[in-house]
């Protein structure tokens, strides 16, 4: 099986640096032309997002100084920097928004995401060892976007053995991720604005002792023969940090950046220096924000989780590639997932998908499914849920008007139209990965999960793909490329069970006088209810949110009925 010519020669993207053995790496390669390069099917890098920065950014910023960070972590010998780098950025966003405090009680468990990122009993998943298998940033993003975490450190401590991990165990996950943005590694203002808006950005650099001017200043001046990927959370910057602070001597040659300025980085080695475990890395470092180790990313959105919310998905590992194989054949393609709705009284109110087609037009559809589980090819039977533009590269969740969905199978389609853009047409796909020596990731994809819809026949010479406008993506993989493993699309439906928390207009998990106030304010347009809040607010279920619902909540709280008054 080949990989659509997408197996590339590149430095290993594994992120493995622990407190000890800082010069040890799974790959000791230089650039893409290095004779030591290996052919490795690394996860895609995709197009990062460049933001329109219409504000004057300050010369310095620090989430650390603003106390928007949890206590520093200590990864010890465990090669899980990729877990700490991602989780700590999410912690900072939640602290910034006042959702959690900045104590160690708010730590997310790196051990849990590490265990989650090991092979399942059926052989699917990431093919790596617990604690010492290195990792990719995609593991953390897949873990959080599938709502498998974050799990509290108190529930799954650092010292937990792998035997304690149970994929089916239900944890108390209070907040779930709904947005992750990949960043343009070359646009400094985009990165600064993301740090300022979201508190932190997760990225990676080349950790090697010769690149350290001291234990608080790091600078790699150019392509290195000592690639040793290390993941960190960048929580600030300072344009005036002296370039002289980063002078390094490498094999007898002295290097100093040309300009002042540096990024403030949160490490995961405990309080190993006199800067509380933080350090500065020069703006001119060769590998900081490089896509050699995968995309740099920021968490943009999340939602409060409760028993009423359910995420419906055919994959749980997230995007390992971008399905952009049809770009040259079709600039307007609909990608479809068939999802199982297990309960009654479910209302679809959000759709999450992963795409790097920044700026492309998208249309979300509800698509009927026949008795065999195949989405309808008759587009007149589809219901448009929402239209818009792909706002950034990464995982995006769109709110849709609540739609009742029956128990059983439903189709959710994401049409991507890149006709008027330079973007490549694609959708995230959970697809198998390997390098020349070993398998990296095994997909859980099966037939009947993901489909492709095109208005024109782009497979005229492939009978199995030319009979219908709707084709199982597994047929594409097998018939076009002799690949029987394939992958499935990253398209998820989020539902809300109506009536479970009737009256909970502000979605704080309880029904109290604050909900009545929120509803009353919404009637005079001084408060905007979310789509979930509108469902809950309509406590008398008359199809409208008004003062009658306020009265019903007041009666509920007083535990009296209208007949008793």
Q: Which positions does each model-derived feature cover?
A:
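Sec-dependent N-terminal signal peptides of Gram-positive bacterial secreted proteins and lipoproteins
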Residues: 2-25
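Low-complexity, acidic Ser/Thr/Pro-rich repeat tracts that form intrinsically disordered stalk/linker regions
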Residues: 24-53, 565
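A short glycine/serine-rich beta->alpha loop
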Residues: 68-78, 126-130, 505-507, 539-541
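Predominantly the structural core of cysteine protease catalytic domains
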Residues: 29, 47, 54-66, 83-91, ...
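Aromatic- and Gly/Pro-enriched, solvent-exposed loop/edge beta-strand patches characteristic
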Residues: 359-445
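Alpha-helical support elements that line or immediately flank enzyme active sites
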Residues: 77-100
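Cellulosome-associated attachment modules in secreted, modular CAZymes
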Residues: 18, 22-25, 497-565
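PGST-rich, cysteine-poor low-complexity/disordered linker and tail segments that act as flexible spacers
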Residues: 433-500
């Amino acid at each position: 099986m080949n990989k659509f010519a997408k197996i590339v020669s590149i430095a290993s993207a594994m992120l493995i640096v622990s407190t000890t053995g800082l010069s040890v790496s799974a790959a000791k390669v230089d650039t893409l032309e290095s004779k030591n390069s290996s052919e490795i099917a690394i996860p895609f890098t995709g197009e990062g997002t460049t933001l329109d920065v219409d504000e004057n950014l300050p010369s310095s910023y620090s989430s650390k100084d603003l106390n928007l960070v949890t206590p520093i972590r200590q990864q010890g010998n465990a090669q899980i920097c990729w877990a700490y780098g991602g989780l700590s950025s999410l912690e900072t966003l939640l602290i910034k928004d006042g959702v959690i405090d900045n104590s160690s009680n708010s730590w997310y468990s790196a051990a849990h995401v590490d265990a989650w990122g090991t092979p399942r009993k059926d052989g699917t998943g990431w093919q790596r060892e617990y604690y010492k298998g290195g990792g990719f940033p995609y593991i953390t993003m897949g873990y959080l976007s599938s709502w498998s975490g974050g799990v509290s450190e108190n529930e799954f401590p650092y010292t937990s053995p792998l035997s304690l991990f149970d994929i089916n165990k239900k944890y108390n996950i209070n907040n779930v991720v709904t947005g992750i943005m990949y960043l343009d590694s070359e646009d400094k203002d985009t990165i600064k604005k993301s740090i300022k808006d979201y508190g932190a950005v997760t990225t990676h650099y080349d950790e090697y002792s010769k690149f350290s001017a001291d234990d608080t200043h790091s600078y790699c001046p150019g392509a290195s023969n000592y690639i040793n990927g290390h993941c960190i959370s960048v929580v600030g910057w300072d344009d005036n940090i002296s370039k002289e602070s980063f002078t390094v001597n490498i094999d007898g040659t002295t290097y100093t950046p040309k300009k002042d300025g540096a990024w403030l980085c949160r490490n995961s080695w405990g309080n190993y220096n006199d800067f509380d475990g933080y350090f500065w890395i020069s703006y001119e470092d060769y590998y900081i924000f490089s896509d050699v180790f995968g995309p740099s990313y920021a968490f943009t959105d999340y939602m409060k989780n409760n028993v009423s919310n359910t995420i419906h998905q055919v994959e749980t590992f997230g995007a390992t590639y971008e399905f952009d194989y049809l770009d040259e054949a079709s600039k307007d393609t609909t990608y479809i997932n068939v999802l199982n709705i297990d309960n009654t009284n479910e209302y679809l109110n959000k759709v999450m998908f992963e795409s790097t087609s920044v700026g492309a037009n998208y249309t979300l559809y509800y698509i009927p499914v026949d008795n065999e589980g195949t989405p309808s090819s008759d587009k007149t039977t589809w219901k448009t849920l929402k239209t818009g533009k792909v706002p950034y590269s990464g995982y995006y969740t769109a709110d849709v008007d609540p739609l009742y969905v029956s128990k059983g199978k439903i189709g959710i389609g994401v049409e991507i139209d890149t006709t008027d853009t330079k973007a490549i047409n694609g959708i995230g796909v959970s697809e198998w990965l390997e390098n020349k020596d070993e398998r990296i990731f095994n997909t859980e994809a099966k037939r009947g999960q993901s489909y492709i819809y095109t208005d024109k026949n782009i497979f005229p010479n492939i009978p199995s793909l030319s009979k219908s406008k709707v084709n199982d993506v597994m047929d594409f993989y097998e018939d076009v490329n002799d690949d029987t493993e394939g992958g499935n699309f990253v398209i998820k439906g989020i539902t809300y069970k109506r009536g479970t928390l009737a009256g909970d207009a502000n979605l704080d998990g309880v029904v109290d006088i604050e909900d009545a106030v929120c509803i009353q304010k919404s009637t005079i347009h001084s408060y905007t209810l979310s789509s979930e809040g509108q469902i809950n607010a309509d406590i008398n279920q008359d199809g409208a949110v008004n003062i009658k619902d306020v009265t019903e909540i007041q009666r509920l709280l007083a535990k009296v009925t209208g007949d008793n008054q």
